[in-house]
């Protein structure tokens, strides 16, 4: 769990920025959003398949775009 120590003379904005950076690195917010509602194994697999297809299509698009420049 992220946590910071506020130093003397630290402004609130600076401490908040450091805390926010730590939470972003540890994926706390995204994990909370993912666990907000129960998700069955089949739903997880379905989402993984969809994301895998998106990655493949993105790679193909980038590859074709790169090849067209040659």
UniProtKB/Swiss-Prot annotation:
GO CC annotations on file: ribonucleoprotein complex; ribosome
Highest rank taxon of the organism: Bacteria
Pfam family, one: Ribosomal_S21
UniProt xrefs under NCBIfam families: S21p (TIGR00030)
Protein family: Belongs to the bacterial ribosomal protein bS21 family.
HAMAP family attached to this UniProt entry: Ribosomal_bS21
Protein name (record): Small ribosomal subunit protein bS21
The organism of origin for this protein: Helicobacter pylori (strain G27)
